[in-house]
Amino acid sequence: MVKQRDTLTSLSQGSAHEAGRSNETDQQREANRALVAQVHEALFTGHDVSVLDSGFSPDFIEHSPLVKDGLAGLRQLVSDCPDMRHEAVRVLADGDLVAIHGRFTGLAETPLVGFDIYRVAHGRIIEHWDGLVPEAPPNVSGHTQLDGTIGPGEGDAEANRIFITRFFTETLIGGDYSGFRRYTDGTNFIQHSPDIGDGVDAVIAFLDDLAAQGNRLEYQRIHRTVAEGGFVLTHSEGSISGRRHAYFELWRVVDGRLVEMWDAIPEVPQDHEALHDHGIF
């Protein structure tokens, strides 16, 4: 009886410890989300460059092909773009990464939509990647690049990350587009890409047509993922017609099935052609 009581006590203490760690992780994730959302808004909409000192690490690493190195590059960007504004639509937090899906105006003649990924360390932003493309009209199914489901929901982020990584490896890196049937319900798929309509048939036909024209979307590797609830953002590298591209693709999973996606797929320079020495990925 004593041994049984000791075992139960040990299990109880272990469960409490795990719950404490989980709560601590949740708190850190929410702190990172709040930091990035506040700093991003203050800098790119409010043009408050003081956040470069309060919210960024002095050793900040910039990977964006649009910005020169470090904090000086961000300061110059804000100075050069007095009409710049940003509308955040989705903000995902996962460990030390926070991803923002939204729309920039004032950076170019046409609004730009896409993704920013930030890495946070010790309460400061330490690293940043982005992928932005020109805003396009709604696709043939009436969806824009930003509308649709907003919140991540209550899904199992780690299970969904594994699911999407497996789908991505088989279907996009491996080029077996029938994966869109295996990982969805086989028919339904909500599409926010400007060039493709809804449905599994539409996305497979689009990818097959590109391949037949010699313009296959080539995927080489996933560099990072940001998963929260039913959302998984993949940041990957590849090429189209021999030109290097970054693939930012946001997937939504419901009950173990792929149901919706958004993307931004900009052409990017080779690392030695970038405005900095940190590489694009």
Language-model features: locations:
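C-terminal and inter-domain tail/linker signature
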Residues: V2-F281
